[in-house]
């Protein structure tokens, strides 16, 4: 199992804004179809969740927020602990865009990340919040 984690982490980017961080990073883009520009005070929040147990709330493995992310496609890098993505867990990436403290866009479907896909660029689509 440790070998699978190491293989999964080997291809990940190891660049992070955290000083001294040398661990794996999930990377990719967040996009939406709406023809709406984001204001400068928008906040993009990315979370890696463990949703293995269906009878329990999701466990937040890591979270990162970026203020003023620009316009779509929004590039992201989400550092995570190497042991977070394992074959025996179901892990998903969640994206949310907030403006003035209110959710404007969110990812309505689970974006599953596995040991095989974690090293590839992730493409997360978000939809307008209800």
Kindly label every feature range from the protein language model.
Residues 11-15:
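Bacterial signal peptide processing site
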Residues 35-41, 55, 85-86:
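A short beta-turn/strand-edge loop motif at beta-sheet boundaries
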Residues 24-33:
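A short, amphipathic beta-strand motif
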Residues 52-85:
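Tryptophan-paired
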Residues 94-107:
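Short acidic/polar inter-strand loop motif in beta-rich domains
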Residues 73-75, 113-130:
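Extracellular beta-sheet/turn segments enriched in Thr/Pro/Gly and aliphatic residues
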Residues 32-34, 50, 80, 99:
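Short solvent-exposed capping/turn motifs at the termini of beta-strands
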